[in-house]
């Protein structure tokens, strides 16, 4: 009788070769490497990165990112809980299927994170940036410095929050970094969560975010038109809306080329709500948007998100538990220079749903698009991961 070979990403030659030569500075970093690098290496291979790029990317990850992931998560250890995943882990890999582009996101953590020196992890991101900037030409921190100053807490804010016991179960992540991997190079991005700043100042997240970007527009007026259009859409939904701004991001490149993205969380998980996010309540009605709307409806039919009102759950899930929850919808709006309207992107939040059923729906969608290689390899890749 024949046997079925189940793919296993731990067999990656690149991962094994690098592993043979590592002298880990501590056990935590060793655990991080061996639990993340096999999947990372396999994703790079499947996405078509050449061998030289695979080694370079994994080398940067090993030497300049893993040192900022903190203690390796277990069920019993005391660790910083990151908003990046529902399990509080500070690292996540993702794949842009249509462009075969791998990305990873992480919340930088250091020895001061969560201590009296840095109770809300405000400062460790600077050390992480110091490690990354010499590795890639073109990194520019102008937008980041502006937004971080406006939207994350300083030491005075931190003291106020602690003295008045205002944080409680509030998620404490304030900023994280992402690397879009293009060949052996990367484009660096940041994500900023103003929830703690809102607590410290008494201002809404929406007010903080939009006011900060408007101030950014004083030196970059080409971003103002799409920002005003987005604000008008958000305000039109009224004070009792189920949709609200949650975070923003920007590219850490030349300000004249950097994009700002504003993210909206929608608690009402319905096709109608997602259509409203995609078209900005009918404000976007060009041919490209309408074509995307048809694809959105097709995906909704294939994935079958259970409808209903979904609050963002608290607290974090314990490692190893099977999720029995569904997350709200989310959309982001990219502000491009010299464009009148923002560009939407919507997220199908499938966390907590059956992976096999979701994979079947995606394979069907890939086949209909003519993405034959992705359709043929997607399930095997998931099994390998």
UniProtKB/Swiss-Prot annotation:
Keywords recorded for this protein, A-Z: Alkaloid metabolism, Transferase
GO MF assignments: tryptophan dimethylallyltransferase activity
Enzyme class: transferase
Pfam family, one: Trp_DMAT
Species per Swiss-Prot/TrEMBL record: Arthroderma benhamiae (strain ATCC MYA-4681 / CBS 112371) (Trichophyton mentagrophytes)
Positions of substrate binding: 103, 189, 191, 259, 261, 263, 345, 347
Name of the protein this chain belongs to: Tryptophan dimethylallyltransferase
A Gene Ontology BP annotation from the UniProt entry: indole alkaloid biosynthetic process
Family to which the UniProt record says this protein belongs: Belongs to the tryptophan dimethylallyltransferase family.
UniProt lineage: Eukaryota, Fungi, Dikarya, Ascomycota, Pezizomycotina
Domain of life of the organism encoding this protein: Eukaryota
């Amino acid at each position: 009788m024949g046997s079925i070979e189940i793919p296993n990403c731990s067999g990656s030659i690149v991962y094994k070769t690098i592993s043979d030569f590592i002298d880990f500075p501590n056990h935590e970093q060793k655990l991080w490497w061996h639990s993340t690098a096999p999947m990372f290496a396999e994703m790079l291979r499947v996405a078509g990165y050449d061998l030289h790029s695979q080694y370079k990317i994994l080398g940067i990850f090993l030497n300049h990112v893993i040192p900022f992931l903190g203690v390796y998560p277990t069920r019993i250890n005391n660790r910083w809980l990151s908003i990046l995943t529902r399990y509080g882990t500070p690292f996540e890999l993702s794949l842009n299927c249509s462009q075969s582009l791998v990305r990873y996101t992480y919340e930088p953590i250091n020895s001061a994170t969560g201590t009296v020196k840095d109770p809300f992890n405000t400062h460790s991101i600077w050390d992480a940036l110091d490690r990354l900037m010499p590795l890639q030409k073109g990194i520019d921190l102008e937008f980041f410095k502006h937004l971080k100053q406006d939207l994350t807490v300083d030491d005075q804010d931190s003291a106020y929050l602690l003295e008045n016991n205002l944080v409680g179960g509030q998620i404490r992540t304030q900023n994280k970094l992402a690397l879009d991997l293009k060949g052996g190079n990367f484009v660096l991005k940041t994500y900023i969560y103003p929830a703690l700043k809102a607590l410290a100042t008494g201002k809404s997240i929406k007010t903080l975010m939009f006011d900060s970007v408007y101030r950014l527009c004083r030196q970059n007026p080409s971003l103002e038109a799409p920002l005003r259009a987005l604000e008008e859409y958000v305000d039109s939904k009224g004070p009792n809306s189920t949709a609200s701004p949650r975070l923003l991001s920007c590219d850490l490149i030349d300000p004249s080329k950097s994009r700002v993205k504003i993210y909206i969380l929608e608690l009402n998980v319905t096709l109608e709500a997602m259509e409203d996010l995609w078209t900005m309540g009918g404000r976007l009605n060009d041919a490209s948007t309408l074509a995307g709307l048809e694809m959105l409806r097709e995906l909704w039919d294939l994935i079958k998100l259970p409808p209903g009102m979904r609050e963002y759950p608290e607290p974090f899930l314990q490692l190893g538990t099977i999720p029995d929850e569904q997350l709200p919808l989310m959309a982001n709006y990219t502000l491009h220079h010299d464009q009148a309207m923002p560009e939407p992107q919507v997220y199908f939040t499938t966390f907590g749903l059956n992976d096999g059923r979701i994979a079947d729906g995606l394979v069907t969608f890939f086949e209909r698009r003519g993405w034959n290689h992705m359709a043929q390899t997607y399930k095997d890749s998931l099994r390998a991961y």
